[in-house]
């Protein structure tokens, strides 16, 4: 099936997430890896008329992409920094306060780490930490939670932030899975370390460490992330 080329104006990650995660479709790209306005859907039945099935899938995808396009355009109207204040309404954990408080904590820690290991990036680190969670209040991340960080990077670039700051917003979530990609920039590594350290210290501090059978806040993964980030740096 296919969809309108206008939707290619939406960030690629939004389109592929919609197709792969939500609709279980295969996006189509050209030889250079550029997304094309087509998709492949797989059916476990043999339809009488494949064109009817294709049109049905196109209709469903268009509705999803129309929503994504609306979210993207609406989100762009609010500068990323303006969303930071809204994090006061987002509860990180009842015992650890709001996401705004969490940002305040790990922002200070990130600046201290930068001062010790790479003073030249301290300003970028401070700015990236401030904006790191701002996209949680966006319509797009509200609908597609797996795009947190990715949309933060996009909206930061749209707002005119330095590429190093925008990239650090994305990278601070890495690694997303055990053995996954690690931050490549100093800014992303430092903000990521501070965020993960704050999470681990916070939950241990309120008496909620992982147990042999449960780790609901992925603290082990966060700890492994810290170790791997440190080992990956020169």
List the model feature ranges, each with a label:
Residues 1-234:
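Amphipathic alpha-helical "coupling" segments that flank catalytic cores
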């Amino acid at each position: 099936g296919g969809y309108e080329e206008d939707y290619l104006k939406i960030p690629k990650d939004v389109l592929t997430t919609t197709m792969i995660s939500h609709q279980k479709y295969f996006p189509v790209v050209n030889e250079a890896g550029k997304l094309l306005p087509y998709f492949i859907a797989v059916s476990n039945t043999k339809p009488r008329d494949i064109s009817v099935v294709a049109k049905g899938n196109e209709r469903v995808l268009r509705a999803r992409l129309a929503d994504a396009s609306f979210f993207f355009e609406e989100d762009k109207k609010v500068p990323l920094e303006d969303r930071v204040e809204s994090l006061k309404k987002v509860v990180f954990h009842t015992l650890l306060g709001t996401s705004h408080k969490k940002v305040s904590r790990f922002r200070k820690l990130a600046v201290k780490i930068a001062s010790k290991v790479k003073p030249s990036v301290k300003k970028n680190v401070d700015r990236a930490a401030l904006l790191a969670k701002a996209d949680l209040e966006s319509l797009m991340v509200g609908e597609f939670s797996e795009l947190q960080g990715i949309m933060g990077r996009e909206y930061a670039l749209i707002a005119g932030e330095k590429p190093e700051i925008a990239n650090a917003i994305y990278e601070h979530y890495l690694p997303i899975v055990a053995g996954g990609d690690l931050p490549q920039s100093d800014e992303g590594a430092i903000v990521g370390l501070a965020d993960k350290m704050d999470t681990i210290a916070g939950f241990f501090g309120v008496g909620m460490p992982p147990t042999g059978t449960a780790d609901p806040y992925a603290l082990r993964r966060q700890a492994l992330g810290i170790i791997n980030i440190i080992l990956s740096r020169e």
